[in-house]
Regions:
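Catalytic cores of nucleic-acid endonucleases
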Residues: 8, 65-113
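Flexible, charged surface loops at secondary-structure boundaries
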Residues: 28-30, 53-54, 80-82
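Short, flexible loop segments at the rims of nucleotide/cofactor-binding pockets, characterized by
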Residues: 38-40, 62-68
């Protein structure tokens, strides 16, 4: 059986990124949203976290833990067509930078997190996905989550794209 370390996401990132993901996941769980980490998207991008709510709403979270990484990120708009809501998640020291217009404060939400918890500082705008896209994304999400659970039972099944 796979070891716990083999099954965890965010194993090749700075520990602070895994801490932010953990805090966001705890917050989402309290809000009845459940996340899959490092979720591949059809456009070749990979969402740090993608969560589903009880009504099938999809939320993508992009985690940033360094100012340089945040400023250099030009790909995040590519996530918007695959979710109903989009959030940035950052440690407390980066929150101020996400007020800049280029980060669409009227559209993108902001979560500040550490390894213990997280708080929504700015709510994300709700932009409902078209029905056909929603169906495709929900199916993809479910299959990815199921595949990861199957790999827990038999590691040879892996978690390939």
């Amino acid at each position: 059986m796979a070891s716990q370390a083999d099954s965890l996401c965010f194993t090749d990132v700075p520990p602070i990124a895994a801490d932010v993901a953990r805090g966001v996941t705890r917050l989402f769980c309290r809000q009845d949203l459940f996340a899959v980490c490092e979720m591949p998207l059809p456009n070749g991008r990979r969402a740090d976290l993608m969560a589903i709510d009880a009504k099938g709403g999809l939320t993508i979270v992009e985690i940033k833990v360094a100012k340089g990484d945040l400023i250099g990120d030009c790909k995040w708009r590519d996530y918007l067509e695959y979710c109903d809501r989009f959030f940035w998640a950052v440690p407390p020291h980066l929150a101020q930078f996400l007020e800049e217009e280029r980060y669409l404060p009227g559209e993108a939400g902001l979560i500040v997190a550490d390894r213990y918890d997280a708080a929504v500082i700015r709510q994300a705008a709700h932009r409902p996905l078209p029905a056909a896209r929603r169906k495709a994304e929900l199916l993809r999400f479910a299959r990815r989550a199921a595949r990861r659970l199957s790999a827990q039972i038999d590691p040879s099944l892996g978690d390939s794209n």
